[in-house]
Amino acid sequence: ANMNNPLSARNFIPEWCSVVVRDRNHPSIVAWTPFNETWERPDNDEAALQHDRMVEDVYALTHSLDYRPVNDCSGNYHVITDLWTVHNYEQDPAKLAEWLVVKDGRYPCQDPKRDVPYAGQPFFIDEYGGIKWVVGKEFSEISWGYGQGPRTIEEFYQRLEGLTDAIL
């Protein structure tokens, strides 16, 4: 949803409330994530204020409906959040490990000019890997993913294991 469009916000808020109320007693829900990858967060000050206000309002509204943590924007451009989440699809395990190093007391973020500063929240990589691969094909129009696709199942598992080990 384009959070800078008042009609989108007007439609999203009641639908989001109904989702939280409907599912708040479900035992498998450990956190609420109203937004994913808010790439449309503008650099323009006025539009950025609208975006941030929408995120802040939905965060507060979610907390008013349930006690669980709220991950405001999964992956990037956090405004107010109980969980610090990032998405990283680096395909080289060594580069991923280097990216994850805490520098100056900060976990990595996608864009320091757009993200609020990290404030000690639990840190999650909630998306990674995304390995491009179609069994038996080096490249295919139907394949989707990141990096050069592996040539064998063994190469796929080796890359996945390397990326996972870099995180752990």
Predicted regions mapped to residue ranges:
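Substrate-binding/catalytic cleft of secreted carbohydrate-active enzymes
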Residues: 1-168
